[in-house]
Amino acid sequence: MANIVNFPIIDMEKLNNYNGVERSLVLDQIKDACHNWGFFQVVNHSLSHELMDKVERMTKEHYKKFREQKFKDMVQTKGLVSAESQVNDIDWESTFYLRHRPTSNISEVPDLDDQYRKLMKEFAAQIERLSEQLLDLLCENLGLEKAYLKNAFYGANGPTFGTKVSNYPPCPKPDLIKGLRAHTDAGGIILLFQDDKVSGLQLLKDGHWVDVPPMKHSIVVNLGDQLEVITNGKYKSVMHRVIAQTDGNRMSIASFYNPGSDAVIYPAPTLVEKEEEKCRAYPKFVFEDYMNLYLKLKFQEKEPRFEAMKAMETTGPIPTA
């Protein structure tokens, strides 16, 4: 059972308090969450409850209509229902991906009706705006100029932005199969709209797995590996996983605001200068090179990935535009 602790909850509405006191307190809460958790949950954000309710309803309807039977067929074919030992090479999840930037694939994804496509485009646009707002709040806390992180993510065609739509159906053997194995996220900032009734998401904090509590109309935010690099380790990406449940079908809609594939990622010079050693603790690399490595090593510790990128850097320096 996961440790029960006070998970950080950020009230975005208080950022609009122009006397500055509440705003300063909220910025401190975000800073503490980034330093000590790598995760936080935002409420009273810019997405309407009406939009979120509609996205949840249509996503669950879509799963029942188009994906549920395919998932049942898959687990039978893979022999997961009859597994007798730990399963380490597959996850108990049904997923599809929507790409928004640099180009959208929503019109090409099969089995989406027009109303759902239109809805997910609207949802993605609002999540993208919230992602950029949060990145600017991180800049403010770090002493970076506004839009520094957004600009750092921009390649020739802007950032990479997409959404992973997942369902985690009831699992007969949650002790043997994970909903999603432990990993850190490769990219920038991740915004998750998760089920408010069925739990399962956990993060690793101080050596213990901690539940991320379901909360209606909230958005869970976590930091990816690229923010760890750009902040020179001030903020860390954190291992997290999904525990399969025997009851309930958990919905998860995770949107990833990542660097463009050709974006060059490296620690922000002003943050390096603030360090006592004035030392760059992370390498400089092209995001696509990191992703190619990550796809092979996703469910392993992140440190060897950073070391591998350091080795690549020494063999060929990357010019900075």
Curated annotation (Swiss-Prot):
Pathway: Alkene biosynthesis; ethylene biosynthesis via S-adenosyl-L-methionine; ethylene from S-adenosyl-L-methionine: step 2/2. Pfam families: 2OG-FeII_Oxy, DIOX_N. Coiled coil: none annotated. Residues 159-259 form the Fe2OG dioxygenase domain. InterPro entries: DIOX_N (IPR026992), IPNS-like_FE2OG_OXY (IPR044861), IPNS-like_sf (IPR027443), Oxoglu/Fe-dep_dioxygenase_dom (IPR005123), Plant_2OG-oxidoreductases (IPR050295). Fe cation binds at H183, D185, H240. GO terms for biological process: ethylene biosynthetic process; fruit ripening. Keywords: Ethylene biosynthesis, Fruit ripening, Iron, Metal-binding, Oxidoreductase, Vitamin C. Transmembrane segments: none annotated. One of its GO terms (molecular function) is 1-aminocyclopropane-1-carboxylate oxidase activity. It comes from the Eukaryota. This is Probable 1-aminocyclopropane-1-carboxylate oxidase. The lineage of its organism: Eukaryota, Viridiplantae, Streptophyta, Embryophyta, Tracheophyta. The gene is ACO.
